[in-house]
Amino acid sequence: MIETAVRPAEVEQVIEHFDVLIVGAGISGIGAAHHLLEQRPEKSFVVLESQLGFGGTWRTHRYPGTRSDSDLYTYGYRFKPWTGAPIASKDEIVKYLAEVIEAEDLERYIRYQHTITAAEWSSDDRRWTLSVSRADTDQRVQFSANFLWMCQGYYRHAEGHTPTWEGMDRFKGPIVHPQSWPDDLNYVGKRVVVVGSGATAATLIPAMAPDCAHITMLQRSPTFFFIRPNTNEVADMLRELDVPEEWVHEIVRRKILLDFGALTQLALDYPDLAREELLRPIREILGDDYDIETHFNPHYQPWQQRIAIIPEGDLFEGIRSGQASVVTDEIECFTESGILLKSGATLEADIIITATGFDMNVLGDIGFVVDGVPLDFARTITYRGLMFTGVPNMAEVFGYFRASWTLRVDLIGDFVCRLLGHMEELGVSVVTPTLRDEDQDMTLLPWVDPADFNPGYLARMIDSLPRQGDRDPWRHASNYYEEREALPVADLDDGALRYV
């Protein structure tokens, strides 16, 4: 066999420098760019995105029925009114983001097909230098920035999480993870088994059910769901009164946050009552004869895992119609024609879909180095869930688990812009979270308390994530209702941020 030598891509010698470098052009990165333009227009910035276009998750997820599992009044930005149905499809969300980009001319700041492979901080130079691979030109290039704003999200987009089961290689049909959905998959008239019962499964099944011979959701244990109509009465009433869309958006947003906050508090204070509130509409659809206890009453408490909204109860309508069914059991092994369960039952299938979750990335899985020393984020302590001890001039957007992700995009956008302005006022160029003397002996805790929130993707990565302290400002509150009051007035001169 003749092997062809491939010459390594050349490294471009010119290093482009910016005041701020935003990583990712998904909903977080686009939001960050907006806040910079609006609040710190004097700052130069660039957005580096590894994909072919903007959108992040909404670009990479291509499976049938892809939609939000949060309402768009709160998942959308506070500055861009949402005018559609509360739960939106992937295409509607991409269109919404495109409108933001067009309205603010953000396209000129975004560099697509730029994958960051390394980020090195130099205290001598007081800047980050990033090594970047360009897929469009097959070049390796470099950028430098005074401040790094990580908006990469927490999915590993390359592939999803699929456990290994005995006999998978024996199955004659395709085994597909939704995160790697093939465009040519034909499921019309086929028997389909979806392994998993999270938000992805709850989206796939009602979208596919009308075309399949039958579709089965196979789950090891039940999941909580939140059934809601895909309309908003308050929004409809306000629009009938010709209230401006900006007002409609803000009023409905506040009402949803109020209602959702009450439900969350109910779940924390009276979990049994919250459980019944979640199960009642399922019983109303499926009837008293359906085994709700086995298939839809989880072993964990409400809100220990994220709860997906099911618009119009479409998943359960499919079950009631007979197009879909649920099996609660464990997999013994795959067979040539389906799955053998530990109960001894078999599920015949032409296609098996492993909707078994995703793997988290840690700060984009980028190799970080600070003054020549490789950075282990698991050894850092978070400052307010957005910066990290010993890591200069960097902030990360990590959204909420119990509320819409984008609520924190806006809060962190305000905070970072306020911090950048404060640094200008002080005449400094470096800010680093640093433990004060009184913090040295504080108890260190996981990034998220597993007793409070424990989905599989988080449990698999918890040892790789930064830790939090038992006091402010070292807590990762992950609570919108707390942070909307605390972050805007957080003291930037309390000694926890060291300026140079």
Where are these regions (language model features)?
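Flavin (primarily FAD) cofactor-binding/catalytic cores of flavoenzymes
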Residues: 2-25, 31-52, 57, 89-191, ...
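Glycine-rich active-site loop/strand segments that organize a redox cofactor
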Residues: 50, 55-99, 222-284, 288-289
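Short clusters of hydrophobic/aromatic residues that line enzyme substrate/ligand-binding pockets
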Residues: 68, 77, 165-168, 296, ...
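A short, structural micro-pattern
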Residues: 69-71, 362, 388, 451
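Short coil/turn segments at secondary-structure boundaries
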Residues: 73, 292-299, 470-474
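C-terminal, flexible cofactor-proximal segment of oxidoreductases
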Residues: 201, 224-227, 381-382, 393-500
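Charged, low-complexity surface segments at secondary-structure and domain boundaries
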Residues: 259-269, 300-304, 433-443
